[in-house]
């Protein structure tokens, strides 16, 4: 498993950047006029992603960075605290509440600030000081921990991911999945691949 993880895991800094991109893309689906059930799904998807991201940084990445830039690491812990507070506040509200949109936008402001700070200061420092090998090792640790954190929420994550897409996108995705399944089934038949390549 370690050998396979080391081949498929991104470096720690790449993984963090990917998490940032995922959070921003998820939040981009949130609009004031979005139906309440979709707003809730977007927020829950974002909340889980941010929770996993924060745990990975706090348990693995920040301890490795503490000796390099302890003040910046402490600032990031504080930003995580603010994100967690806003997520809990959102979970206590209904999407139809006026405060829901305001709180969601405040969460996004904190996330954007956090992303900007990490990607312009902390991550470049990590790449410069820790080096490629250590970042790869941290990436493997973070991948292993991510799998542990996400596994209990796989069903919830899948349902909320589908709910966050507009109906047309979900329909197209469904049709593509069915098409992929049918193609795979055809290709696994003894004559399937030969018929396609003949």
PLM features: residue spans?
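Small-residue-biased structural context
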Residues: 1-198
